[in-house]
Each structure stands twice: as structure tokens, then as C-alpha cells.
Amino acid sequence: KLTKPLKNKEVKSVEHVRRDHNLMIPDLNSDFILFDFTYDLPLSTYLGQVLNMNAKVPNHFNFNRLVIDHDADDNIVLYAISKDRHDYVKLTTTTKNDHFLDALAAVKKDMQPYTDIITNKDTIDRTTHVFAPSKPEKLKTYRMVFNTISVEKMNAILFDDSTIVRSSKSGVTTYNNNTGVANYNDKNEKYHYKNLSEDEASSSKMEETIPGTFDFINGHGGFLNEDFRLFSTNNQSGELTYQRFLNGYPTFNKEGSNQIQVTWGEKGVFDYRRSLLRTDVVLNSEDNKSLPKLESVRSSLANNSDINFEKVTNI
């Protein structure tokens, strides 16, 4: 809803700015809007496929923070900020600020005030915070019943219904034909497919990888009516992680059963990994749960020697 006023508008000017030290944007007003993403996103992809804007931006410029501001003429100005916080691209648009404020007012009643606590003094510049509701409301807890996606269903999708040779050893079943190979582990219910025809051609170009994997996964029904969303990207290997969401919130699992990991090649899937467990029935629970206070969570994180906050960019 918030991006709707920005769609299909013209970009009047583009400016690329780099800072070797802390990033400063002197033109910012005090009432800007901030969008944070959990992953790096190519600016050209976001402008073209999300906002439907045409703009000549730096090649392969990725960002994970978008600042929405306005200039003296009341035009919306976008600042796409790089993950390392040294670069930003400034785009001045033809969208008027009052149109954006109207959209903001429409959703504000559904928004919940949050407060933040910095987790570690050494990470202030990287804006590593814990966010929690200022006035927490009661939320439901859920228990889920899982069932298993059939291996045959995944094979039909990834092998394109071609003839498959099957072999089994020590709880691992291997399926292959002349273009690909897949392994299924009975114990952890993990499925791993590799496209042999793309063996030398994995892509790390996010401008191609993100649209390709998104269209593939949604197009073939691999989500099976579950809510999976792009959650993280690896710019070196090109691997994308799609995470299962429930009621708008991300789910987490130590064994990775809540994720699909996929890498794109020149013409299609290069590598595809996922658990074949899926949520079947969600059970409401009326049990009361006592959650720890925000400060105790912050303290536990800051004093946990197993967490290296130099490598943490989003909480």
C-alpha cells in the first residue's frame, strides 16, 4: 500500500554518492520513511519490477535500505543505500509528497509502535538493534501439524516428467536422468536437486537470479499454498534463501526445515534444496505464555559469546 503512490512515476534525476567513512545524507528531512530489507536487492530490479520506474542507475548496484523523503518542491526523493553504508543512489521522482502521506495515513492505524535498543556499542554504525513493541499486545501461539510432500511431486517439477533412474543406499534415495540428479534423505526429509546441464553456469547476477527463482518457485507450485518469501541472498555464490512465513511472521528452525535454498543458472535452476515437510493444520492454542522483557533479551544477546555481532546486520 505504501509503494502504490510511487508506482509508474518518472524519475527526474539520479545521483550516485559514495562516502569512505560514515554515510551522511545532509539533505534529509526529519520526517522520512525507512524501508529495511533482510537481503541485498538490485536497484534496477526493484525499480523495474516493483515500482515500474525507468531510470538509468549504476550497474549491479545493490541495496538493503530505502529512505523515502521529499525535497523543497514537495517531490518524493528515494535514497537506496548499500549494505556497507558507504554508497547511496538518490532518485528524485515526480511523485508528490502529499500523495504518499495519504497512503501512510491509511495504513497508520494498523501499524504498531516499536522501540529499539542497540545491542552492542561497536555496531552502532551498522544499526544493529533489537526491536520490540512499545506496548505489547496479546498474541496467539500456534502449534502446527506437518505432513510430507511426495518426492514424486518434486521430481515431476524439476525433472520435467522425464524418465528417472532410482537407486537407494543407507536411507538416501537418488534419482537421476541425463540432465539432473536429486537426493532424498529419509531421516531428515531433505530433498536436494542439482541440474547437471547448468553445472558450470551458476549465476550470481541478482538482476537475473531474483526474478528467475521467484517466477520458478511460484510458477511450479513448489510452495504448495504456503507463504514463502525471499529472505536472504549470497552475492558470492548466488544462492537465495526463501523463508516460510506464518500469519505474516517469519518462522525459524534449527534444521532449516522452514527454508528453500535455490541457485539460478544461465537458463534455469542450478541447485535446489528444501525439506519436504509442509504445514498441514494450524492449531490455535489458548495457553498463556510469558515472554522475557526486552532488556533481558538485549542483555542475553550482548553477553552471548556464541554470537559475533560483527557479522550481524539485521535483528
Task: Show the residue positions of the predicted features.
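Exposed beta-strand-loop-beta-strand "reactive/processing" segments of non-cytosolic proteins
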Residues: 13, 35, 146-187, 224-276, ...
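Short, non-transmembrane alpha-helical segments in secretory-pathway proteins
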Residues: 10, 145-154, 198-236, 282-314
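Preferential activation on post-signal-peptide N-terminal prodomains/segments
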Residues: 1-205
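Zymogen propeptides/activation segments of proteases
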Residues: 55-56, 62-90, 210, 214, ...
